[in-house]
Amino acid sequence: MQRLKDWTVEDLNEEQKKVHDEIVKGPRGSVVGPLRIWLNNPKLAKVAQQVGAYARYGTSLDNSLSELAIITTGRVWSSKFEWEHHAPLALSLIHI
């Protein structure tokens, strides 16, 4: 049973749409996973996505190490989304 109604862009209020557009225009390119839930509270979504974007894109790690850290953490914490979303990205960055 779904606890929160899924939404389309047309369902978003002005504040949600602004945060949505910031996310889509950034390096993520789309609003998926936890970001979709967080967007129910646009203030939370804005801050959480900024922290996540920094952790993923703003560190000194190259992309392959960043993705390795993400999937390792996702695996340790049994985060299905992190594993399913980031494992293909990590594999695409392996140069063997």
PLM features: residue spans?
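Short, charge-rich binding segments
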Residues: 62, 92
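Conserved small/polar residues in nucleotide/adenosyl-binding loops
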Residues: 94-96
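Acidic, glycine/proline-rich low-complexity segments that act as flexible tails and inter-domain linkers
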Residues: 1-61
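Mid-length scaffold segments of soluble, non-membrane domains
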Residues: 78-83
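Amphipathic alpha-helical segments within well-ordered protein domains
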Residues: 35-36, 52-53, 70-71, 87-91
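Alpha-helical scaffold segments that form or flank carboxylate-/histidine-based iron centers
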Residues: 33-36, 63-76
